[in-house]
């Protein structure tokens, strides 16, 4: 609906019976305390209240949805490199965005390498990603032939079974770290599973990083317009600038992913969305998380 009545909104936010109907795993995987904490936090901000109602209860308010960046604009920015070519010794810092979607979505880690170019006085950016799809989701996907092609070519990873195992994500990060990739901040959606984030924190501490610093390296990024709007505008500026400030890896999925990404505009704010269930934008969500972390590191965002 475009709007919901105040009493309906309050029922969603307070009724434990409604929660149980929406989430049968309540009390098993997800606890009431999680809902209570998210709702208490959201009541302080109208945008966050919209996000909580959308994500926790599957009730959506609609805004104006428009296309964003087409794949044809991304292809000229792609180069024959991967994130492992962007090392600390060459001055590159890497921001990581993680979208641990479930079901038939992709399980994605996006990387954004950033370096200051002393000759031009500008920042340089490079984006790459790792993504997985569940075998069960692949078998039912309208995009199966396309996904199978990318899997065969090594661009998309296949995860057996019906459940994502977050060890795959940690293994990917470990491999990047061992190859000299300097990952400085990790953005994630706090409305998704906390297990991968707990594993991430444990791995960072195993590297000898103090627990307090680990907490500052792992940054929650909510997928609502208030958080995404600055990152969307920045990324759009980088991509559409006459000079090539940002490049993308040679992964052929990039143009398809960007074409899937639509923008919902409401109250002069923008957030990422998609047109059809089979459209995948998880990697782009991760890229926005990377941009958010970059701004956070540079003091442009306060949490």
Features from the language model and the residues they span:
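Conserved helicase motor "Helicase C" RecA-like lobe of SF1/SF2 P-loop NTPases
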Residues: 193-213
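Non-catalytic, compositionally simple segments
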Residues: 1-95, 104-106, 124, 128-131, ...
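Acidic, metal-ligating active-site segments
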Residues: 103-119, 281-290
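Nucleic-acid-processing active sites and adjacent nucleic-acid-binding tracks
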Residues: 113-183
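An acidic- and aromatic-residue-enriched active-site/binding cleft used to recognize and process polar
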Residues: 99-103, 114, 188-193, 221-226
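Beta-sheet entry/capping signal
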Residues: 1-3, 92-96, 106-108, 123-126, ...
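Metal-dependent DNA phosphodiester-chemistry modules and their immediately adjacent helices/loops
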Residues: 1-17, 207-301
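Short glycine-rich phosphate-binding loop at a beta-alpha junction
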Residues: 180-197
